[in-house]
Amino acid sequence: VTVKGRTPERSPRIIGTGSPRRQVQIMEHGDVECRLLRGNVDTRLEKLYQGEYDGIILAAAGLNRLGLFNDPRFSFEFLEPEMFIPAGGQGIIAVEAKKGSEVLKILKKLNDKEAERALFAERKVLRLLGAGCTAAVGVYAKEENGTFWMGLMRETKNGLIRRKISGAPEDSM
């Protein structure tokens, strides 16, 4: 998110985020400095508008839910998950129901098997890496045209590692 019509005059550009995973991916793009950004979405946007940051990274789902894409003060650029890898499980909706209930039968019909397979694969990778919520690790899996695809990024002491793999959906687990 940037302020509409504002061109940053400072170098490096200051980008705000609260996520270590996002910070390391932003730093790949050259002339930028990452600064910690805290607060609710309105607070973060106000800090951007007041000039504390040249841009901030926010989840599109949250901006959409809050109706903020219509705010005329801001410009929005969407980062593709294949390139700017999200946290594992991002975007998944989970619903709990009592075992054996009628609700569970309905929910099973609504379940997206491809999304479920992707989630299980992402969670398995996170477990294998021992990645907690503060780790700079991203994993994104999806099925497309009969192929299972996964992208992974992880910060190490030697820098950022990125990997992409693909294969048959039945081999995803």
Residue ranges and their predicted role:
Residues 23, 29-173:
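Small-molecule-sensing regulatory modules
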Residues 1-35:
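A conserved helix-loop-strand patch within extracytoplasmic ligand-binding domains
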